[in-house]
Amino acid sequence: MNTVGTPLLWGGFAVVVVIMLSIDLLLQGRRGAHAMSMKQAAGWSILWVTLSLLFNAAFWWYLAETQGREVADPQALAFLTGYLIEKSLAVDNVFVWLMLFSYFSVPPALQRRVLVYGVLGAIVLRTIMIFAGTWLITQFEWLLYVFGAFLLFTGVKMALAKEDESGIGEKPMVRWLRGHLRMTDTIENEHFFVRKNGLLYATPLLLVLIMVEFSDVIFAVDSIPAIFAVTTDPFIVLTSNLFAILGLRAMYFLLSGVAERFSMLKYGLAVILVFIGIKMLIVDFYHIPIAISLGVVFGILTITLVINTWVNHQRDKKLRAQ
């Protein structure tokens, strides 16, 4: 696998992730099960974004010093583009978590505990998926066309799909788990397992955790190929992806109270997926520069947010008129 990642870069990335996760877990342990406030969520979100940008700046500086700016500039731009794509697509993941927690009636104080383990599991699963995907692409380059067609299909499907939490209980995964696990009827505080009459029971909280992990794998199948459209360097794909999902938990609590205000966002994300899919399909005929890709993704998100703001304004105006 061709990569700009050196032992120093890999080691530096690992140290940053381990330190930040340790601090996060330590604070979680001291405070116990409680909901993250909007102020805390905003603070952690800003911290993760700032840390990601600082890492990219350090990454650029290291490459500029060791290999020159002709290498550093496009690689740092690839990281930024991959990070923006993953961060954008992660919002849809957050909305699915909202539906899961609502359907299973998980109180806010326990949602944070589930998401701690959910993000840790996502780090492991995505790392495996990224290295496996990179290896497959190096062996079978035609897979990029498969990924492109898949993203094109997914984008159209996302735009047309209707989100409905009422059908969660009928999902094959949920039905299978309920049929094969000895499970309590109600959530037992913050426990994933409890003992009753000498028998070990799973709790609905474990079911929610498994569904959170499962939903992340499903979204990773979309987002990881999307970053492969920008670069196939495993270091950039992994670091941009993980930095984006490390801030997912804070993003969840930041958006959980205002999710209904982002009704148009899924259409913007759908357009991004369609654009990336087309980019991958036409790569042999026309190579879209990374800077153009970054501009297009940023432009789509900006236009979507402007339209979303206008829609909310019109809706609020109608409500006030009633």
Curated annotation (Swiss-Prot):
- Keyword Ribosomal protein assigned to the entry: answer is no
Chief localization: membrane
| Membrane-spanning parts | 7-27, 44-64, 90-110, 114-134, 136-156, 199-219, 226-246, 262-282, 287-307
Q: Which InterPro entries match?
A: Integral_membrane_TerC (IPR005496), Integral_membrane_TerC_rswitch (IPR022369)
Q: Which residues lie on this side of the membrane: Periplasmic?
A: 1-6, 65-89, 135, 220-225, 283-286
Q: Topology with regard to the membrane?
A: Multi-pass membrane protein
- Pfam name, any one: TerC
Highest taxon of the lineage: Bacteria
User: Where does it localize?
Assistant: Cell inner membrane
The record's Gene Ontology cellular component field reads: plasma membrane
Cytoplasmic-side positions? 28-43, 111-113, 157-198, 247-261, 308-321
Entries under PANTHER family matching the protein: MEMBRANE BOUND PREDICTED REDOX MODULATOR, THYLAKOID MEMBRANE PROTEIN TERC, CHLOROPLASTIC
Q: What does this protein do?
A: Has been proposed to be a redox modulator.
| UniProt record similarity statement | Belongs to the TerC family.
State the protein's name.
Putative membrane-bound redox modulator Alx
- Say which species the protein is native to: Salmonella typhi
